[in-house]
């Protein structure tokens, strides 16, 4: 899928730190946005006992999924590149078009890596470089 992973399995991380998987929340954000987007697992765990790891945006953010070739919106359930409209960016750019791929569902959306040919980006790259240098 193009999503980066670490060399350490999540089960080992959970064992060492003693944190339940239901309490590990992934944050998706970028410097260009004022807002962050989080997994819904804590909310779903404490409301109905489920494990919903789909992303949810705050009410002032709209994420639109677009066909990579035409930049027209795709239907829910279809993969597209993600554009974010963040009303908290009142003093800068309102919208950004990422090269991230994702699929929207009724319950949120999942990230599926980067578009073909897109440069790898993100904080995890620095972590990967440090880990590789110290391996």
Residue ranges and their predicted role:
Residues 1-135:
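Active-site glycine/GP-rich loop and adjacent strand/helix microenvironment
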